[in-house]
Amino acid sequence: MASLDLSVKAKSYLHKLCVEIPSRRVGSEGNQAATDFFAGLVASFGFGTECPAFDCIDWSQHGVTLAVDTASFEAFASPYSLGCRVRAPLAVASTAEELEAMAVSHAVLLLRGGLTKEQLMPKNFPFYNPDSHKRIIQLLETKGPRAIIAATSRDVEMVGGAVYPFPLFEDGDFDIPSVYMTEEEGNRLVTHAGQPMALEIRAERIPSQGWNVIARKGAHPERRVVLFAHIDARMGSPGASDNASGTIVLLLLAELLADYRGALGIEIVAVNGEDYFSNPGEQLYLSANAGRFDEVVLGINIDDVGYHRGKVAYSLYDCPVGVADTIRRTCSAHKLLVEGEPWYQGDHGLFIMNQRPALAITSELLAELMGGITHSPKDRPEIVDATKLAMLALALRDLLLRLDEGAA
């Protein structure tokens, strides 16, 4: 299939995943529609498919009211927060040491300063959780304030660092209702410390389900290449580059492999949950493949690959010399592919942690994306170049066929 034809299909898939489906957040109807669309399409290309499911929550919110006497304050519900209606005195803490010395079970607690300099990792996040974050969460749950207000500034290290204010909590396992506000609003509010205040969070957690989509071909699945792209999107973001782009590359690749009859196993996985607080799809895949990662010849992760600026960058992790040579030789034939810097925040970490060779593919300008576009409303279809998605699908097809020749 010609690159031009693939580009046209890529544009139509982009419209489907980002416009016709308004949200792909885990647990939403849009997320379920996206995985159903992916599963049906890859099955039509002759792949055997399965869709292992997991329980999760969707979330709905209808705003926040926060007032002290006649003064009102702008605040936003923390993603996945429980709702509440509270009237209680305002307490304030700026450090863990201050919090440890306080009794706040009767109060609404305003967090500011050092306690809110960076977003706290979800309490049950399995792959990374620093002790400093765990200490803050443990203190909050022990002290048990009736609700929490977080005054945050800018976290330049956070993905989507241009978002201001940022939510201190994004955690459906943390059950103290919470909101967040700007540093300036926090400075206004702190002058009312000790006074009674009213807070209403109109929000609801909704039990739901999501699922991964796993598509397989090849005579020998016990020796296979696994290709990941996470299909979910961050709440509030169209998720065009992150990661409709990677999902579309897998769909184009599946069509290019419609007639594949090789020995090497090929496993295409639309992983569901990379942008969700507990990574349920990743955890489900790890559990299902426990003791079987030795079968993986190469793990490939495709994320944020379609940005219209710059080229597409690849990086290698613990690849045998022969596999690395094949990757570099294949990529060198495509002018929009360049070898880039290593990065470890994506789903290729599942292969690395299981000591398997990995290939990560993303934008050459990933830092630019993460600094102001990724996880934000700016991640729209207009920033994605469909020709890059077509090129990458063709390059991956060539790579898989060469790896199959080596396996035969």
Walk through the language-model features, giving the residues of each.
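Extracellular/luminal Protease-associated
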Residues: A75-E170, D175
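Soluble metallo-hydrolase cores and metallopeptidase-like ectodomains found primarily
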Residues: V68-A101, G161-A240, L252-D259, A263-G265, ...
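Acidic/histidine-rich catalytic neighborhood of metal-dependent amide-processing enzymes
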Residues: V156, F166, D175, Q209-N212, ...
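Noncatalytic luminal/extracellular "stalk/propeptide" segments of secretory-pathway proteins
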Residues: A2-V8, S12-L120
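Active-site-adjacent substrate-binding region
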Residues: A147, L168-D171, H308-A408
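Structural recognition of the beta-strand scaffold that forms the well-ordered cores
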Residues: V108-L111, A147-A151, S178-Y180, I214, ...
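N-terminal capping segment at the start of a domain
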Residues: A2-E29, F45, P52-A53, D155, ...
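Second-shell loop/turn segments in exported
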Residues: M1-L4, E20-E29, V92, M121-D131, ...
